[in-house]
Amino acid sequence: MTAEGDGSFKPGPPTERRGEAPDRNLAMELVRVTEAGAMAAGRWVGRGNKEGGDGAAVDTIRELVNTVSMRGVVVIGEGEKDHAPMLYNGEEVGNGDGPDCDFAVDPIDGTTLMSKGMPNAISVLAVADRGAMFDPSAVFYMNKITVGPDAAHVLDITAPIGENIRAVAKVKDLSVRDMTVCILDRPRHAQLIDDVRATGARIRLITDGDVAGAISACRPQSGTDMLAGIGGTPEGIIAAAAIRCMGGAIQAQLAPRDDVERRKALDAGYNLDRILTTEDLVSGENVFFCATGVTDGDLLKGVRYYAGGCTTQSIVMRSKSGTVRMIEAYHRLSKLNEYSAIDFTGDNNAAYPLP
């Protein structure tokens, strides 16, 4: 306000809202979102209905994320608005307060794993400053290679896989035969698998869930030294958020499926020969990553039910501090159902005893 000559005041010009950076409290708000998504999907484990489980997780995450203090825009979600009524790309999420953020979510990474009761299904999300995440819309797949912090400086996606394996083994003080490479089990990877086997390295084939595989490659004592191969671009960006927090490295190149997708990418200005680094995929200093296990896996334990409640295990990371937290939580479903808008019981007639 400014003073007039008669001592009265009049409003001054409006001031712009200062950009607000995501703070550390956001991490705990976000992990509640993936916990809820995992608990909702946990009721569908092994039931052979991946759409039902994914839908339950989507509904729950959307309900919870709109209580989080942020002004988020979905950069990676369930698809375009016409095909995804919730968590579609471009949707605004959060409660309207707090920092402006890019929001990436995969309610269930590994829907087939969940539906079959197989290991390594997780509920996962990432948050970064607005404009920090690479736009994945032009090309659905990318070729990627991932390693942990100790080998980040020797990674070269343009080199043969054998050279990468030998370089990583050298800096990790391993023999090539000690190395384990994680690869999605797909027909397109037949040559890659042959090339890795020719080096003498071991292979860990996974049917789905390459976000968890990429994180395992960055974690000591995980038993995985590298992830390689073609996988989803959205999953690559979400994995890059985790890798930013862990100090590892991912390199990627867009991999169009056909001439139509290639032309679409070129028309949109993408350089298909460009090597995308971790920072190209997710830039900025404020990157958050959260994941909660749905089924037991190498990265996280799945949702486990007991009389009166369930337990979840989550991993929460923040790039600014470099902190990685493992969170074990016990949820009293009998208490949650007293106030939550979400039905975590999966049975309207259930009467859980108190634990």
From Swiss-Prot:
It comes from Mycobacterium leprae (strain TN). Mn(2+) 1 binds at D54, E78. One of its GO terms (cellular component) is cytosol. Keywords: Carbohydrate metabolism, Cytoplasm, Hydrolase, Manganese, Metal-binding. It comes from the Bacteria. It is an enzyme of class 3 (hydrolase). This is Fructose-1,6-bisphosphatase class 2. Substrate binds at D109, G110, T111, Y141, R186, P187, R188, D208, G209, D210, G232.
